[in-house]
């Protein structure tokens, strides 16, 4: 029995050594990923002339294997409250899949071209800034009351609703009303480069999940006009063409998805 003691000690030593090596390797990989994300965030900030570092994530494990192969599985970039000449503030998002780093380093220089297998690009305007633009200070934007889409509640993988029948609720003071009303609004894009967002009010909504406030017939046209507008300058990160527009939560989102594109960090912010 006593002869087993040295064997047990040897096994314990081997296991402890292996665990230490594994923990060290994971720690090294994690540290390298954090440094790469920090440098990428700083490079995006400088390239896009942002006021602060955007949120950046390089996804996939192990990181070092991806860096050595000059190929990242996925990168997420999110910049909130970016100055926008038309609406005041907007958020910019991009998700890059299958990124070829052949022409750049694992730290990704701002001007280095990256071949991206799939790129999802979004510009997001919250209810507050849409309302300020429309001069409806208490505006709340919501997805259509009836969605027949997937489990995310939207028609896209990122959970964006359809573009028809969004619910806009607010007080149309310019029309002479002092109570909140709910209006059905359709979204569309126009212009040669599809960067003008058109909001078209189509009718008053009453009943559950609305302000449930009718509008007098003599005020209807004015209210619908007040809830209709055009918002120019909606350029998506990396200049991707829009493919959908809708709501998520209380935000309006324009999204573009492209396959097989070459971009660099200088193109993240377009306006």
Regions found by a protein language model. Give the residues of each.
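Hydrophobic membrane-targeting and insertion signals
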Residues: 1-68, 84-86, 266-271
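Short amphipathic alpha-helical segments
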Residues: 32-36, 122, 215-219, 223
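Short secondary-structure junctions
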Residues: 47-54, 136, 234-239
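N-terminal beta-strand/beta-hairpin edge segment
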Residues: 51-131, 135-174
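Hydrophobic membrane/lipid-contacting segments
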Residues: 97-102, 156-218, 252, 257-259
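Short, solvent-exposed secondary-structure boundary motifs
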Residues: 130-131, 171-180, 228-239
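Extracytoplasmic/luminal low-complexity segments enriched in Pro/Gly and acidic/polar residues
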Residues: 200-271
């Amino acid at each position: 029995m006593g002869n087993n003691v040295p064997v047990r000690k040897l096994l314990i030593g081997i296991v402890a050594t292996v665990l230490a090596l594994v923990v060290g390797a994971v720690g090294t990989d994690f540290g390298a990923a954090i440094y790469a994300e920090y440098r990428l965030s700083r490079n995006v900030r400088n390239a896009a002339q942002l006021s602060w570092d955007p949120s950046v994530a390089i996804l996939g494990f192990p990181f070092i294997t991806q860096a050595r192969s000059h190929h990242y599985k996925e990168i997420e970039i999110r910049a909130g409250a970016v100055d926008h000449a038309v609406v005041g503030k907007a958020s910019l998002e991009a998700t890059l899949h299958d990124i070829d780093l052949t022409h750049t380093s694992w730290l990704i220089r701002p001007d280095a071209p990256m071949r991206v297998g799939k790129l999802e690009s979004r510009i997001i305007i919250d209810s507050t800034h849409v309302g300020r633009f429309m001069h409806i200070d208490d505006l709340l934007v919501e997805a259509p009351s009836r969605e027949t889409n997937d489990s995310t509640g939207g028609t896209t993988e990122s959970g964006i609703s359809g573009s028809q029948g969004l619910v806009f609720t607010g007080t149309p003071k310019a029309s002479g009303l002092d109570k909140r009303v709910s209006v059905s609004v359709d979204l569309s894009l126009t212009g040669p480069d599809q960067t003008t967002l058109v909001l078209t009010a189509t009718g008053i909504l009453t009943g559950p999940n609305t302000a449930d406030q009718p509008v007098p017939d003599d005020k209807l046209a004015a209210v619908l006009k007040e809830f209709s507008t055009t918002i120019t300058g909606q350029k998506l990160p990396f200049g991707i063409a829009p493919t959908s527009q809708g709501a998520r939560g209380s935000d309006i989102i324009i999204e573009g998805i492209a396959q097989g594109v070459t971009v660099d960090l200088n193109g993240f912010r377009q306006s």
